[in-house]
Each structure stands twice: as C-alpha cells, then as structure tokens.
Amino acid sequence: MMIMKEFTHTDEKGVRMVDVGSKPVVRRTATAEGHILLREDTINLIREKKIEKGNVLATAQIAAIVAVKRTWEIIPLCHPLPLTGVDVEFDLDDDRITARVTVRCDGKTGVEMEAVTGVSVALLTIWDMVKSVEKDDDGQYPETAISNIRVIKKEKLEL
C-alpha cells in the first residue's frame, strides 16, 4: 500500500515557496544523469571535434553550469542556493552520450533540481549543436532523442 504524502508547496490557499528558514545548513550533494541518442557518425564527429558549431562537449559543460546556477530563476518554487561546486561529465558510446552533473552546496534545501536542470540543458545544448548533422533529408530527427533523465544519487551530511 502506498502512503500519500502531503505536498509542501500547496495548501487550500494556493501555491507557495516553502519556508526553509528554520532548517539547519547541511552539506548537500546530488548527481543526475541522462542520455541523448545520436547517429554513430555524429558521435564520431563530436569525438574528432569536427562539428561546425564548435566543441560540443565543452559548450555543453558551460551550458550545464550556467543552468545549475540559474535553476531558481527557471523553476518557480526552487530556492536560490549557495552552490559550492558543479561537475559535468560525459560518457560517449557508439549511439549515445550520457551526461552526468553533480551539484554541491552548504544549504537548507537540496540540489536535486539543480542537477536535473544541468543535465537537461547539457543534453539540449548537444542536440542544438549537432542539429545540422542529425537531420534527415526531410529536416526531421528520427534517431535523436533525450531520455532517462533522473537523480542517481543524493546525500546530506551534517556540518
């Protein structure tokens, strides 16, 4: 049997941002990952740094970091957080790139949404940079897909 939890952001008065003022500052870490499916030829062009728009993975790293820092501006009920670090990594396989983003902060609320936002924007940036080589003759993207974006690890450590 599933136990229903109450939402912290809504009540009979409407939507609100949760007050975390009385919570202790805790060292928080979250890691998220996701995949983008691409043609093998596209992956090889990325590896060889031959994509016309520039270095795909370096650009996606920068985009992910910017997205993490601005998550509170994009997602309405997220708090601005005192981030202490962001790591962005990529694994390239024959048909996909896996993006992994780890976010750290010493704060009163978690960094999961920041990690998920970073992964999402990294993958969207990759797609944007390879559009010209991923399109088919009709201008469609039959093989390109973003999938499996999820939090794979979350930690809280008392200071």
UniProtKB/Swiss-Prot annotation:
Transmembrane segments: none
Pathway stated in the Swiss-Prot or TrEMBL entry: Cofactor biosynthesis; molybdopterin biosynthesis
GO molecular function, one term: GTP 3',8'-cyclase activity
Active site: D128
Pfam families: MoaC
Family according to the record: Belongs to the MoaC family.
NCBIfam families, alphabetized: moaC, PRK09364.1, PRK12343.1
PANTHER family: MOLYBDENUM COFACTOR BIOSYNTHESIS PROTEIN 1 (PTHR22960:SF0), MOLYBDOPTERIN COFACTOR SYNTHESIS PROTEIN A (PTHR22960)
HAMAP family attached to this UniProt entry: MoaC_A (MF_01224_A)
Official protein name in the record: Probable cyclic pyranopterin monophosphate synthase accessory protein
